[in-house]
Amino acid sequence: KKLWEADEASTNASLMNLAIYSEDPDSLLRNSDAIQELTREHACRAILIGMDRGASETRIQAWITAHCHLAHGKKSVCCEQVSFLLQGKVIGRLRNTIFAHLASDLPLVFWWQGELSDLFEAALYRMIDCFVFDSTEWDDPRAGFAKIEEAVEARERIVVQDLAWTRSHHFRMAVAGLFDDLVAQRALGEVDSLRVVAHSGQRTTALLMVAWLATQAGWRPGLELDIAAERAAGCDECFMLESREGRSITVKGEWDDAGAALGLVELHAPDCLVRVSREGDASYLQQRLECPGHELMLRGPADEISSADLVADQLSRSGRNGLFRK
């Protein structure tokens, strides 16, 4: 408080509490850099927590930092950051540390990095208004999503934001944009294959993209899933879906570690091709529609690459993310 009173050129600004938690004790410096970028557009009170659960000695270390940015070339707007390194036994210390340093009248956005450990419990998530995570970081996504579902049931108004879902935002918009075309709409019921290419570390991102397409198109798991999947060749991961019309749809997942997180979404019908692609870290997506006597080629924005930029995008869009929760 005295810091802000002594500096007439700076204003302390906060629109939310933003906590970043990691069980990597070396994460504090990296996450401080992320806060520096996030506060350019999102004023907040930042709480960084690094946890070293394997330490033999139980102790807490804390640091206070201010991230300042010039507002219209005049007064600088500053956001306060409190960083904690918790070592050793952590029973009750995580939530108590957060509780004690929240701006009580502001919502809490909590970004959990890495696996959901036993510290993700009701006493913690009942404090949270928006929970940000990245399911591509989990070894067991099924178990992780079960914990998320439990949290949503216990606290209905919590907003959950998976960066694996955010990472495909512009891909989804690009595919939807191509299907605004009447020719593509007529071909949707005849789609017989879907090909998705992604980085091997982004399997969940790819599967969420497939799930979105299936939900929007009304596809369901095929009745002969296992047998049909064995017949589908030339892919790293294959399975079958069935359209509303009863048509079998082969889904082919391929991993390209030299490419983008999500590099290609391609739908085939007998006479039509709908394709959205991204080359490496290009800042744009290429959209293509090919049907007899009708061709369309467009470009659109691509999704951000870094996790911090994805979080910034998600904070800008806000909303309850109802489609993801389906």
Regions found by a protein language model. Give the residues of each.
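An N-terminal, globular interaction/scaffold subdomain
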Residues: 1-111, 118
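A generic structural motif
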Residues: 45-54, 110-114, 135-138, 159-162, ...
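Acidic, Ser/Thr-rich peripheral helices and adjacent loops at domain boundaries
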Residues: 62-73, 129-138, 150-156, 231-233, ...
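Short N-terminal or domain-adjacent regulatory/targeting segments
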Residues: 1-14, 63-65, 165-184, 326
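ATP/pyrophosphate-binding catalytic subdomain of soluble kinases
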Residues: 164-230
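Structural alpha-beta junctions
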Residues: 36-48, 102-109, 126-131, 153-154, ...
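C-terminal structured domains
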Residues: 2-8, 12-17, 25, 33-35, ...
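Conserved, well-structured core segments that form the ligand-binding/active-site neighborhood
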Residues: 82-84, 88-185
